Amino acid sequence: MKKILVIITIFFATISLSCAKETTFKKELFDKALSDGKIIVVSSWIKYCTSCASQMKVLDKAKKDFDNIEYFKFDVTNKEIAEFFNIQYQTTLLIFKDNKEVYRSIGETTKELIYDALKSSI
């Protein structure tokens, strides 16, 4: 039983540490990307959230596959940013195109569905 608990603990620690969890959102960079007409993805996360780690893993791959899109992420406990986007939950994913929000999901971690949303915004 102890071995199973140790394995589970190591597994979840690895998942949460495998993704760089930093805030890359800066309002001035977001505004510039909007004014430049870029497609923008904003994602929210929180420490120790395994679904956040799963979503970040998909988005990290998407950055390589959709390099014409600007990506921002932030810790949902940052109330100023969360209120700016009207986000109340971690793993909220937003896509902006032509200066408006065109997609919003909460908790989506499926690569296929996230990629479909990205493709439809291009």
Where are the predicted features?
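N-terminal leader/targeting and pre-domain segments
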Residues: 4-5, 18-37, 120
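Sec-dependent N-terminal signal peptides
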Residues: 4-14
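Extracytoplasmic/secreted envelope proteins and their assembly/folding machinery
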Residues: 27, 31, 46, 56-59, ...
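Short active-site neighborhood of thiol/selenol oxidoreductases, capturing the structured segment around
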Residues: 35-47
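Thiol-based oxidoreductase modules, predominantly thioredoxin-like and allied folds used
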Residues: 44, 67-80
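Typically the conserved alpha-helix immediately C-terminal to a functionally engaged Cys/Sec
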Residues: 51-65
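Structural micro-motif
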Residues: 85-94
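Non-catalytic, surface beta->alpha helical segment in thiol-disulfide oxidoreductase systems
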Residues: 97-122
